[in-house]
UniProtKB/Swiss-Prot annotation:
Active site: 47
Gene Ontology CC annotations of this record: cytosol; mitochondrion; nucleus
Residues annotated as domain Thioredoxin: 5-166
Major place of residence: nucleus
EC numbers for this chain: 1.11.1.24
Keywords: Antioxidant, Cytoplasm, Nucleus, Oxidoreductase, Peroxidase, Redox-active center
InterPro entries per the UniProt record, alphabetical: AhpC/TSA, Peroxiredoxin_AhpC-typ, Peroxiredoxin_C, PRX_1cys, Thioredoxin-like_sf, Thioredoxin_domain
Protein name: Probable 1-Cys peroxiredoxin
Miscellaneous notes: The active site is a conserved redox-active cysteine residue, the peroxidatic cysteine (C(P)), which makes the nucleophilic attack on the peroxide substrate. The peroxide oxidizes the C(P)-SH to cysteine sulfenic acid (C(P)-SOH), which then reacts with another cysteine residue, the resolving cysteine (C(R)), to form a disulfide bridge. The disulfide is subsequently reduced by an appropriate electron donor to complete the catalytic cycle. In this 1-Cys peroxiredoxin, no C(R) is present and C(P) instead forms a disulfide with a cysteine from another protein or with a small thiol molecule.
Catalytic activity field: a hydroperoxide + [thioredoxin]-dithiol = an alcohol + [thioredoxin]-disulfide + H2O
Protein family (similarity comment): Belongs to the peroxiredoxin family. Prx6 subfamily.
Length: 218
C-alpha cells in the first residue's frame, strides 16, 4: 500500500470527531479486535452499498467480538446526512458504528489509506477503499486495498477474520480457500511430540515432500 504503516505496527495515537463523538483511535482499538475501513467519499453509490452491507453484517462482527470504525475525508455533518441513504439501502440494518471525519487527511495518511489517483473537486486526494484489521494488542494484523471501481467482499473479510482469530489462539495456519469449520494446518515449527500436547484431537498427515499435518480447532 505504500507509506510507512506495516503489518505488526502499532495503531497511531490519533483522534478525530465522528458520528458518535470524539474518538481516540488507539483507545477505541484496545481490548478487542477492530476493523477500520475507509471509503473515497460520502454518497457515491458503491460506498453506499458497502457501508450498508457492513451494517447488515454487524451481527456477525459482534459474534466475533469485533468493533467497526469507518473513515472518509468528509465532515461529520456530511456523514450524518449520508447515513439516511445508507439505511434506506439496508432498511433492516441501522448504522451502529461510528464514521470518522478527516477533512484534513491526517488520519487517512497516518493509516496509509490515501488513494493518490482519486481526487475531489478541489484536487485533493481521497481515501481509498482500504480495510485494516487490528488485533487486541492494537497492532495491524491484515490490510486489504481495493480500487474505487470495486466494492469490497465482506464474506472474505469474515473469512480472514476467522483465520486471524484462530491463529491467535493456536499454532496453526489456514490453507488456500479455507472456510470456518474446515481443517487447518499445524505450524511446521511445532514438533510431533509438542503437537500431541497442543492438539490432543490428533491430526491427519498429507504425504508431501514435507509432511502437511491437518487438524480441526475451535
Amino acid at each position: 500500500m505504500g507509506g510507512g504503516w506495516a503489518l505488526g505496527d502499532l495503531v497511531p495515537d490519533i483522534q478525530a470527531d465522528s458520528t458518535m463523538g470524539h474518538i481516540k483511535v488507539r483507545d477505541y482499538c484496545k481490548d478487542g479486535w477492530t476493523i477500520i475501513f475507509s471509503h473515497p467519499g460520502d454518497y457515491p453509490p458503491v460506498c453506499t452499498t458497502e457501508l450498508g452491507k457492513i451494517a447488515a453484517y454487524n451481527p456477525e462482527f459482534e459474534k466475533r467480538g469485533v468493533k467497526l470504525l469507518g473513515l472518509s475525508t468528509d465532515t461529520v455533518e456530511d456523514h450524518q446526512g449520508w447515513i439516511k441513504d445508507i439505511e434506506s439501502y439496508t432498511p433492516d440494518a441501522p448504522v451502529l458504528y461510528p464514521i470518522l471525519a478527516d477533512p484534513d487527511r491526517k488520519i487517512t495518511v497516518a493509516l496509509n489509506m490515501m488513494d493518490p489517483d482519486e481526487k475531489d473537486a478541489n484536487g485533493k486526494p481521497l481515501a481509498s477503499r482500504a480495510l485494516h484489521i487490528i488485533g487486541p494488542d492494537c497492532r495491524l494484523k491484515l490490510s486489504l486495498l481495493y480500487p474505487g471501481t470495486t466494492g469490497r467482499n465482506f464474506d472474505e473479510v469474515l473469512r480472514v477474520l476467522d483465520s486471524l482469530q484462530l491463529a491467535s489462539k493456536h499454532k496453526i495456519a489456514t490453507p488456500a480457500n479455507w472456510q470456518k469449520g474446515e481443517p487447518v494446518v499445524i505450524s511446521p515449527s511445532v514438533s510431533d511430540e509438542k503437537a500431541k500436547q497442543m492438539f490432543p484431537q490428533g491430526w491427519e498427515t498429507v504425504n508431501l515432500p514435507k509432511a502437511l499435518r491437518m487438524t480441526f480447532v475451535d
